[in-house]
């Protein structure tokens, strides 16, 4: 995670970010009319078979956000087309993103630099051993109120792994980003 990236935690103690995405030296579109040519060119970029100055390597949250949004769109599409969930809720998608995230190393996750790790769509929708399809259990029919609990029981094969996430949709925070 580059040093120019913001990190958590929030004023109310939540770990942020939830996950991170690649955002350094990504090949991005450059307007043909742009007067500035600052930035590293994408030497392998071609258009109609010829190299082109229409792409350049850029850094920042604008790059990482596009990677994360594309990944979330793929997860949503998977849930609709393969899992039969016509309108997947954001908290289910968030759980899959968190469960699939790859730890980037020290310090242990979760932490205020990478949250639960770097987004990895393959891990989010495919079991690590790829021998069985993703088996989802989610309960979006009830809300957990303070002081209450729900009990769920699962019968597991001792040779299988289970990833579990309790997620929620965060409440809105301050519009001033350094006061979240």
Residue positions per predicted region:
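Short capping/connector residues at structural and topological boundaries
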Residues: 6-9, 31, 63, 124
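Short glycine- and Lys/Arg-enriched binding-loop motifs that mark or flank ligand-binding interfaces
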Residues: 4, 19, 56, 66, ...
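Short secondary-structure boundary/capping segments
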Residues: 1-3, 33-36, 113
